[in-house]
Amino acid sequence: MAELLDRTDKMLLEELKKNARENIAALSKKLGIPRTTVHYRIKRLLEEGIIEKFTIKPNYKKLNLGTTAFVLIRYDPDSGLTQKEVAEQIAKIPGVYEVHIVAGEWDILLKVRAANAEEVGKIVIEKLREIKGVGQTVTMVSFVTIKEEI
């Protein structure tokens, strides 16, 4: 099977990850390829669903959401809901930025953002634990984020 992305596509994606607003002329210069090629490749990557959307990376500290926490959840199979249904309910909670169904000792992993640890606690205690199907939880507050990609 042929590789889906060639070297040029990968370099183009890396540049767009750094700055999705970079114009075609600048990308052409950085990558050493014609502007028409850059335009065509971006169009193809969009059409093939490799690029889903162009987005931003907010500064969460400036948005008063400087505390990141990860929450592990044990699914309660006696709840009458499927694990996916529980995860979909959790995804609706303000402050929950990611919801993953995972393998292992725990069933669901969340990424939560809030102003401080107290606000994270409110999300977990007042919102998350009220959802039918959420069993035991463990919350880990991040001290420092070393790497985070969009």
Swiss-Prot record:
The record's annotation in InterPro entries points to: ArsR-like_HTH, AsnC-type_HTH_dom, Dimeric_a/b-barrel, Tscrpt_reg_AsnC-like, Tscrpt_reg_AsnC/Lrp_C, WH-like_DNA-bd_sf, WH_DNA-bd_sf
Q: Which GO terms describe its molecular function?
A: sequence-specific DNA binding
Extract the SMART domains matched here: HTH_ASNC (SM00344)
PROSITE patterns assigned to the protein according to its UniProt record, in alphabetical order: HTH_ASNC_2
Question: What is this protein's record name?
Answer: Uncharacterized HTH-type transcriptional regulator PF0250
HTH asnC-type domain ranges (all copies): 5-66
Alphabetically sorted, this entry's keywords are:
DNA-binding, Transcription, Transcription regulation
